[in-house]
Amino acid sequence: KVAVNPDPRSLWKDIPTDKNIKFFKEDYSHEYITVVENEKGPQKDIVAASKRGRSHAHEGKARDDDFNIYHNDSNGWYIIAVADGAGSAKYSRKGSAVACETCVEFCKTALENPIELEKEIIALNSTTEGQSNRAISTLIYNIVGGAAHKAHRAILETASANEDQPRDYSTTLLLAICKKFDFGWFVASFWVGDGAMCIYDKERQYIKLLGTPDGGEYAGQT
């Protein structure tokens, strides 16, 4: 007997999301921000993309993930937010969008006048390893932690306005702010959920994980 197995890719459907659903979102989104060289030398561009997963496409479900990216051309600060909406939550596609947008807007405002923060970052660079710097810890927490708290409040308000439960908008969140200084890059991050962020140096083949992914009682729980 001869058995012929079909190409697995041909078994998967790509059903467009119904545009009439609540909180419709395009099945694919991407953005590229070009950051020009300045007095500190070459900078890093920002690229982000979000594509509906294969299982969602097969069933015609909406893309749950989202992102929001920003670069302040006047002071050099980068802001990056990525959210992976929990698939078990019916409006996670909205929760992820609300979380990303709220965090970036909060950080944009917080970093409009970063003189005190940058002063502490420069001071941190001159301290010996292991020496604590409570001042910068507080400043960073107020920015990235404050952004996450604001995002949580925004999701609660969205749920209330639509007479839904907050859990219907469940989402993970990855947030980072960074800037290039004369001595190198400063990166601060905050995350909620089972995602992960890292710094990758291609030349040195170096990877630095910026935290520990959250885990639930079972695999895939957020």
Role assignments for model-derived ranges:
Residues 1-222:
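PP2C/PPM-type serine/threonine phosphatase catalytic domain
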